[in-house]
Structures are given as C-alpha cells and as structure tokens.
C-alpha cells in the first residue's frame, strides 16, 4: 500500500480523503470567520487578485474546484452573466452546503456539485477556466487532479491554483511561530478545534514550493506556467494554459 502525508503524519493513501473530510466537516461553519482572523483579511485581497487575473468574460464556462464558501464562484457568476456557466464544486458536503446557502443569500444562482478533483465529472475541453483556491494541498494525488483540470479546459483555457506556498526566507521563523502556535490557539478559541488548524499549518509545510508546483503543472501538459507571489510568498497564484 502507498503512503502519503496528512499534515506531518504518514497515512495510507486510502485514508487521507476521509481524514481531510473530517477536518472540513469540523471547520465549515466557522470557515469564513477563521479565514478573516487567520489572514487578517488578506485572503480577500488574494482572491481579488485571482479574479482579476482570471478575466472571466460574458458567456464563458468556469469550474471552481474545492470552492468552499463560494467567494470565487460568486464573482465569476456575475462576470460570466446569464449566458455563462459557473459551477461551484467541492468534495465536502458540509463546505458545499455552506457555499450554496451563502450564494443564494447573496442572490447568486449557479449550479453546485459534489466533485472529486481527481475524477472531474465533465467532458474534455468543456471549460474556459478551472480554479482551485486553497484546495490542492489537501488532495491525495495532486498530479492526477491537475491532469484532470487540464483535461476539462478548452484549448486556450487556463488552470489557476491559488495556494499557500513558501514564504520568503527572512520571515520563516516568524511564520513558523504564527503557524504552529497562533493558528491552533485561534482554532481552539474561535472554532473549538485546535487539531484542524494544526493540520492546516502542517499541510502548508508539506505542499510543494513555487518552483516544484510549476514543474508539476508542466508535467501534466500545462504550458506557459507562471506564478505570482503574494504577501511575501505566504500565498502564490499559479497559472497554466492549454494549447
């Protein structure tokens, strides 16, 4: 049996999805509040930058994978308009329910679906854009998920990955203290769940750095892959294209 990482813990590949699901069932109801607290609201600016780089136009088709509470899908649905098609998807029922309800409360009606990024239930060459924000690091087979994302975009389309990455070296010690001391403390105080936020910190450290993710995207056939460091490399936006 093959092993993978759940944070720093080594687990059998067959166990990871269930463990990650447990984390997100636990944090779903406090997800937005905790995002604001953990990032000082910066996650909103990271998403604004991603939306600007996506440049969705009326009539386009967009797939938002691991879409969580729907921040990106909401913006894309407005940009694509009534002639477009924007799907909010997540592998986790609790997160998808929160995202769907949040969109409806904002007056945004768009299709939602449970979706495993390693087995995307859409035909080849269907979407103009596929996005995944803060979800890739939780996937068991990242290469398989990226290959699936490439499969479903049209020639000329883009895959965009917004994810925690490798912080600039002078900030590493401070970032470690914040990640392994402050985040679990916030998780306990606000969400009553320190272990889930300890996993968050560990999963960030185990995720490929900027250059490694570029190579991973290129290996599945994405081209002209580039990345943008945000907030000193705390987060990076990777963009790959299909021709």
UniProtKB/Swiss-Prot annotation:
Swiss-Prot/TrEMBL keywords: Menaquinone biosynthesis, Methyltransferase, S-adenosyl-L-methionine, Transferase, Ubiquinone biosynthesis
HAMAP family: MenG_UbiE_methyltr
Protein task: Methyltransferase required for the conversion of demethylmenaquinol (DMKH2) to menaquinol (MKH2) and the conversion of 2-polyprenyl-6-methoxy-1,4-benzoquinol (DDMQH2) to 2-polyprenyl-3-methyl-6-methoxy-1,4-benzoquinol (DMQH2).
Pfam families per the UniProt record, alphabetical: Ubie_methyltran (PF01209)
Keyword Metal-binding in record: no
Protein name as annotated: Ubiquinone/menaquinone biosynthesis C-methyltransferase UbiE
Enzyme Commission number(s) from the entry: 2.1.1.163, 2.1.1.201
Gene behind the chain: ubiE
Catalysis: reaction(s): a 2-demethylmenaquinol + S-adenosyl-L-methionine = a menaquinol + S-adenosyl-L-homocysteine + H(+); a 2-methoxy-6-(all-trans-polyprenyl)benzene-1,4-diol + S-adenosyl-L-methionine = a 5-methoxy-2-methyl-3-(all-trans-polyprenyl)benzene-1,4-diol + S-adenosyl-L-homocysteine + H(+)
Domain of life: Bacteria
UniProt-annotated binding residues for S-adenosyl-L-methionine: 69, 90, 116-117
Organism whose genome encodes this protein: Cupriavidus metallidurans (strain ATCC 43123 / DSM 2839 / NBRC 102507 / CH34)
One example GO MF annotation: 2-methoxy-6-polyprenyl-1,4-benzoquinol methyltransferase activity
GO biological process, one term: methylation
The family this protein is said to belong to: Belongs to the class I-like SAM-binding methyltransferase superfamily. MenG/UbiE family.
């Amino acid at each position: 049996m093959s092993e993978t990482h759940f944070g720093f813990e080594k687990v059998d590949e067959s166990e990871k999805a269930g463990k990650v699901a447990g984390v997100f069932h636990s944090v779903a109801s406090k997800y937005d509040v905790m995002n604001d607290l953990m990032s000082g609201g910066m996650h909103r600016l990271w998403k604004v930058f991603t939306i600007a780089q996506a440049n969705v136009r009326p009539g386009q088709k967009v797939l938002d994978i691991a879409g969580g509470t729907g921040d990106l899908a909401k913006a894309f649905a407005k940009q694509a308009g009534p002639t477009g098609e924007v799907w909010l998807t997540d592998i986790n029922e609790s997160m998808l329910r929160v995202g769907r309800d949040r969109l409806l409360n904002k007056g945004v009606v768009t299709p939602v679906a449970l979706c495993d990024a390693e087995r995307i239930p859409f035909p080849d060459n269907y979407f103009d854009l596929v996005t995944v924000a803060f979800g890739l690091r939780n996937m068991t087979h990242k290469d398989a998920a990226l290959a699936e994302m490439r499969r479903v975009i049209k020639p000329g389309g883009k895959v965009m990955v917004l994810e925690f990455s490798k912080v600039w070296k002078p900030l590493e010690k401070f970032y470690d203290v914040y990640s392994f001391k402050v985040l679990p403390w916030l998780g306990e105080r606000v969400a009553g769940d320190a272990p889930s936020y300890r996993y968050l910190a560990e999963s960030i450290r185990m995720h490929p750095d900027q250059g490694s993710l570029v190579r991973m995207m290129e290996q599945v056939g994405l081209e002209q892959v580039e990345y943008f460091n945000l907030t000193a490399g705390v987060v990076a936006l990777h963009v790959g294209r299909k021709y």
